[in-house]
Each structure stands twice: as C-alpha cells, then as structure tokens.
Amino acid sequence: VGFKAGVKEYKLTYYTPEYETKDTDILAAFRVTPQPGVPPEEAGAAVAAESSTGTWTTVWTDGLTSLDRYKGRCYHIEPVPGETDQYICYVAYPLDLFEEGSVTNMFTSIVGNVFGFKALRALRLEDLRIPTAYIKTFQGPPHGIQVERDKLNKYGRPLLGCTIKPKLGLSAKNYGRAVYECLRGGLDFTKDDENVNSQPFMRWRDRFLFCAEALYKAQAETGEIKGHYLNATAGTCEEMMKRAVFARELGVPIIMHDYLTGGFTANTSLAHYCRDNGLLLHIHRAMHAVIDRQKNHGMHFRVLAKALRMSGGDHIHAGTVVGKLEGDRDITLGFVDLLRDDFIEKDRSRGIYFTQDWVSLPGVIPVASGGIHVWHMPALTEIFGDDSVLQFGGGTLGHPWGNAPGAVANRVALEACVKARNEGRDLAAEGNAIIREASKWSPELAAACEVWKEIKFEFKAVDTLD
C-alpha cells in the first residue's frame, strides 16, 4: 500500500520554494522565531502545515484527499535584518480552505493552534494578502467614506469627535447633557466609551434616549447634522441586535461596536444590519494591544484592520502618532491607507508586505483618539488628511470653561488648520503659529492653548519597523 506511517519532517511536504503563488491564494507573512536548533525551512513549513492541512504525524486519511490541492505552502523565507534567528516566512493558502464571507473562519485557520506550537519560540502574523475572489464574498463596511459624508453633509475637512468622560459613573441624564454641550459647541460626533454598555448606574435604554434628545436639540440649534456613537456591544448577539434596532427606531445616524471583544461573528452580523437599515457603524478596537503590541509575537494591527474592513465598520480607531497611545508614524500611515484606499502597493518601508486590491469594497475612516489636544491639530490634519475623525475626549471636556467652549476651541483650531492648508501653508512647520493666530480671535481656543501648552507624551514606540 502507498501509506507509510511515522513522523516525517514538515519541510518535505510544506516547504516549496519553487511554488508560484496564484491570484486566488491568501498570502500571509509571518515573523517566525524558531527554537534553537530548528532550521528556518522546518519552522516555516511547520507554520504552513499546522495552519492548514497538516498534523504531527502521517495519517491514513491523508490518502483520501489531494494534499497538493489543499495544503498551505511556505514558498519564501528571508532573514529579518538586524535580528538573529528571526525570519519572515511567506505562506500561501488555497482559497478552498476558507468559508466564504467569514473572517472568523479565516482567523481560526491562519492564527489558530499554530501560535502555541512548541517548535517556535514566537510567531507573529505581519500581513495578509486577501485575494479579490475572497473579498467579493464579504459585504464590507455598511456605507463607506463617501456615503457617510453625503449622509452627514460634511465635506472638505476631518470630522471632530469626543469621548464622554468620566467614562463610567455618570447617570444617563447627566451623560446626555455632556453630549449636548459638546455637539452644540461645534463637534460632529460624541462617543460612548468602549466600556459603556449597560451598567447599574446607567442602563443602555436610558442612555440611548437621553443621547438622542441631546443630539436632536444640538442639531436644531446649530443647523448641522450631529451623531453620537451609541455603543450596542452586549453580552449576547441577540441583545446587541436589540440595542441596534432601538437606535434605528430613535432615528440616530450612527451606532458603535467593540469588534475584538464582541467578536467577528457578532460584528459581521451588526454590519449587515447597519447597511440594511441605514446606520453608520463606528468600531472601537479595545483589546487590540493584547494581540498586536509585541514585536515578535501575535498579530500586527494592519491585519486586524484588514479583517475589520472585510467584516464591516465605517470608522475604526487607528492610533494618533502624536497622542498617548502606541503608534509609529510610517506604520500607522501604512494601515490608514489600507483602510481608506482601493489599491495599495507593497511598501516594506511602511510595513506593507503585499499589494492589496480591495476591488471597490467601501473604505473605513480612521479615527485618531487618545491624549490629543488643540496643539496637535496641525499635525493631525497633516498626517490623517480630510477622511478621518479626530477625537478629543479630555481635549474637549478638560477645557477650563466647560464642554461647549472646549468643543468651540477644537472646531476653531480645525477650521484654521484646514484653511491654512488650503492656502498652501506648511502645517508641519507653521502649525504652532497657525494655532496662535486663530486663538487671537477665539477666547475659547486661547484658554485651551494655555492649559495644554506643556503636555507631551514622549515615549518611543514599542513596535517599530527596524
């Protein structure tokens, strides 16, 4: 018989340097740190095997299928410059290994058991190339950037948001009041914090009602369309959908979901509901740093961002480059492009390992949030451009005169930066001067400038390119 029992080296089956990748393959770039004594070919082949058809020993049932058709293949290995014993292993997966339209299934295979594999000291998924054939099985973002602008009637500038603080402990009525003050002052959006769900001090239904009242009042007073990201995240999918339905009945424009803690299955269901019912969907990435912050193990955020674009969301938090949370500039701009653009060229200097064509899947607006204030406005406008949401939580609510003046200060600073940019001025070089000029005719901005003139979050990023 052709069956030969026993353990054989992975590389004999799964390391295929001569393989030419197909347009329909899902391609993955792994950063592999093998255990001492394990050659890189064996480590790369082990990753390909354990994340596709392989197991630790030859099995009789291998003969009942065509491994050549279904196996993952490690087709290229390169050492990581400046690191000893660390390699980038490229793996190609045949499309048939994955259920259509399921980010959950894709991740279960590609980043499943293999990450606990003993022959590896550490493993990190750096990037994925999603083939067009697979992308076409996903709905993607409920609406996308252009439709959102049309719904909100806001063009030619970044949008402004604010997370309501203190994040936990306010009653629904006081929470709604804070929302109203911010929106009336000139912000486009306010936001539930990611951990505001339905707690004893503020149940979700009360919050939804008071926030809806606040945004309609602010809308009437300012003549601008306003939104509040109502967090629909809940303990069960059914409860989450119930909250989304209630938000739709209130007629609000946007709801929110924590997509990593809530899970991709729940997120995809919610995104489908949002498209069917005209709701925008704001996505918060709570838990991402558990997965993506370590340089040699886990999964890079650009992979989580691609997965979100497939699963569906209209906004996603994407770091600030200048605030209090982790984020290297080139890397951040790399995945910001992956979220917004239709076609992204391979560019290793920005951490992009593969050329990605999104075949007209709608884009996602990146949200800059975390420790930013008016002095950061020129840098943020320059780094993120118009298609972004800039969120100032403490940077609005921490204003010495209150929420509405805090909102005014941010709006004045933003309009000044956009005007200066449109006149051809260099925001990077002249940013401080632009803010100072604007503060001369805005007492609210002048007060904000005074409060935050010394605040900096100067720490080196942990996850850098080199």
From Swiss-Prot:
It catalyses: 2 (2R)-3-phosphoglycerate + 2 H(+) = D-ribulose 1,5-bisphosphate + CO2 + H2O; D-ribulose 1,5-bisphosphate + O2 = 2-phosphoglycolate + (2R)-3-phosphoglycerate + 2 H(+). Binds 1 Mg(2+) ion per subunit. The gene is rbcL. This is Ribulose bisphosphate carboxylase large chain. Its EC number is 4.1.1.39. PANTHER family: RIBULOSE BISPHOSPHATE CARBOXYLASE (PTHR42704), RIBULOSE BISPHOSPHATE CARBOXYLASE LARGE CHAIN (PTHR42704:SF15). InterPro entries: RuBisCO (IPR033966), RuBisCo_large_chain_AS (IPR020878), RuBisCO_lsu_C (IPR000685), RuBisCO_lsu_C_sf (IPR036376), RuBisCO_lsu_fd_N (IPR017443), RuBisCO_lsu_N_sf (IPR036422), RuBisCO_lsuI (IPR020888). Coiled coil: none annotated. Belongs to the RuBisCO large chain family. Type I subfamily. The basic functional RuBisCO is composed of a large chain homodimer in a 'head-to-tail' conformation. In form I RuBisCO this homodimer is arranged in a barrel-like tetramer with the small subunits forming a tetrameric 'cap' on each end of the 'barrel'. The keyword Transferase does not apply. GO terms for cellular component: chloroplast. The disulfide bond which can form in the large chain dimeric partners within the hexadecamer appears to be associated with oxidative stress and protein turnover. It comes from Uncarina grandidieri (Mouse trap tree). Its cofactor is Mg(2+). It is an enzyme of class 4 (lyase).
